[in-house]
Structures are given as structure tokens and as C-alpha cells.
Amino acid sequence: MEKIKCPKCNSIMQEFDIKPKKASKYEDCIRRCIQCQIGASNAKINPTFIYKDYRNNIPSNLLEHLDETLEKTLNTANRENKKIKLGFSTSEDAVSWIFIKYFLVNDKLPVLQKILNLEDEISEILMWGVSQINCDSGCTEKLKHICDSLGEDKKYYTEPDIIIITKSESVFVEVKVKSGNDKQAADNRNYDKYLLDKFYTDIEAAKKSSYYELIRNWTIGNIFAENNFKLINLAPQKLFSNENQDSDFKLFINSLKDSRNFIQLSWEAVFKNLKKSNIEEYFYNELEKRIF
């Protein structure tokens, strides 16, 4: 296999004599830096770096409350796997946490408010369904109640990447970095619980679109907000360029009531606004290396 340098200490990774397979965790990696506890996935081209300890994939000054949050995420069945995946250099969850936590730790929520084009100041943020500003806000329990009322399995509650609340609106943010929006076959019976007439102009079109992840967020978000809801799809521009040419995606958009409240926000636009703000270079670089 190709020799790989450790991204931390720059030394050549040691190769282990183990059977090659898709690396789902550090121990599966043939190439590893034992000193730094970082492995390279077994892909022949552009391997993903996998940290044995997921915390080492997050800047140390942004680790506050990460462990507590991970212990409370709504999808309880996925908690341990979520920790492992946070250790991947390609992790969308890592990007989501770094992006939001920077503004929280550095008291820069007005900058985030501007980037997301929110009218009012931010009063609460939830990461994977867990409150980050006011633990007594009741928002987590409200979200659980909605998932329960829709008939979701208690072990697999939907946990939106990011929820941002102001006095006038609730905003769900679905974060994408390398992959597209999740699609599932239209014959999946799980669709039915989310396809409520009051949120869609054409239920069959929504189902046929196969955009299962966005449909779940659209329905749960509308119920959560009660009024003034937005769903932001935060992703690289190339994802939107591809999906906007997809007939299934057009079906999804056209099936939504108040489709203007579904917003495509590119990472490129976010970076443009970050450059105009008083943002530390390390934060900009952390996001850039993971997204582009």
C-alpha cells in the first residue's frame, strides 16, 4: 500500500499485517501512527484519517460539553458509532460541531446570525437534539415528544444536525460535506409517518422523490416550530449543482408547502461571510481542510 505520513507528526505510518477490509474504526487500519494514534483507511487513493480518540479530531478549545452532548444524543442506538465516526477526518458531525461551537465559545453568535440571515438574535442551539445554551429550555424533550408522536422507535429518534431558535423562528440545519442528501426507496413504509398533508402539496411526489432525510427534517421541523420554520441545507455548491439537475430533487421541492422556507446555503457563501468578519484564522482553516 502507499506510504502515508501522519497528519500530526509527519512521520511515515507503520504498516500492520492484518487482512485488508473497509476501515470502520482505527483498529481496522493497516497503516497507523502508534504515537499519535491515527490510522489511514485502507483505501488505495485519498485515504481517510481515523483518530482512535475522536476528541483528537476536534480542536482542543472546542471540546467543551462534547462528551456530555454525545451521551444525550436522541438516537441512543447510534451513540457509540457516532463517537467512532467523529474520529474520521471526513466526519460531517465533526464539521457541524466545530462550526457551531466556535461561535458559542467565542461569543460570536451575532456573526452566526448574520451568516444564516436570521432576523433576531439566537436564544438556543441544539446539536443532535441536545441543548447547548439553556439545558432547561425544554427543547430536547419537545423534540423527543414529536418523534414519539410520529411513531418513531425510541432508540432511533431523529436527531437534526443543528437546530437554531430565535424569538421569531426555528431553523433546522442539515449539514453535508462530502456526501449528498440521504435517499431511500419510495416503497419504504417509514415515509408514511412523516407525510402529513399540512406540510406538503403533493404527498406522493414527496415520497417518489426519495429524499427521506430532508422529508423527516421538514416534517419534524414544522411541528417543532409551530410557525415560522426554515430548513437550511448547508453543503458545498457542487452538491446543489448536481441535485438541482436531479428530477427527484425537483419533485421534493415542488411537493413542499412554503417551499421558499427550504434554503440551500453553500459553504462557499459561508466562507465569503466569514472572511468579512473578525474570525480567527485557525477556525477558517479547520473548516476549509475538512470541506474542500
Q: Over which residues does each language-model region extend?
A:
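Charged, terminal alpha-helix-loop-beta segments
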Residues: 1-292
